[in-house]
Amino acid sequence: MARVNSLKCALCFIVLILFVQLNCIPETRVMAVELSRVFLQTSSTDCGEPCVYIPCTITALLGCSCLNKVCVRP
């Protein structure tokens, strides 16, 4: 029983550290991604799908391609 409680306590502690790290100290994030439209070209249309980890899969059928981590249609 003591082992279960210690594992549960360790898991809660890890979750607490991650919560504090992601919400209270944003400079420590592993990967900061800027998905704003400021970096998009003005002649392109946003397709509504990010391509941070996986390239444009669904919207590729519409002719969208990845540009600055956002799927856009030229």
Curated annotation (Swiss-Prot):
Disulfide bonds join 47-64, 51-66, 56-71. Residues 25-43 form a propeptide. One of its GO terms (biological process) is defense response. Keywords: Disulfide bond, Knottin, Plant defense, Signal. It holds the Pfam family Cyclotide. Residues 1-24 form the signal peptide. Expressed in midvein, lamina and periphery of leaves (at protein level). Contains 3 disulfide bonds. InterPro entries: Cyclotide (IPR005535), Cyclotide_sf (IPR036146). Probably participates in a plant defense mechanism. The presence of a 'disulfide through disulfide knot' structurally defines this protein as a knottin. Belongs to the cyclotide family. Bracelet subfamily. This is Acyclotide phyb-K. It comes from Petunia hybrida. The lineage of its organism: Eukaryota, Viridiplantae, Streptophyta, Embryophyta, Tracheophyta.
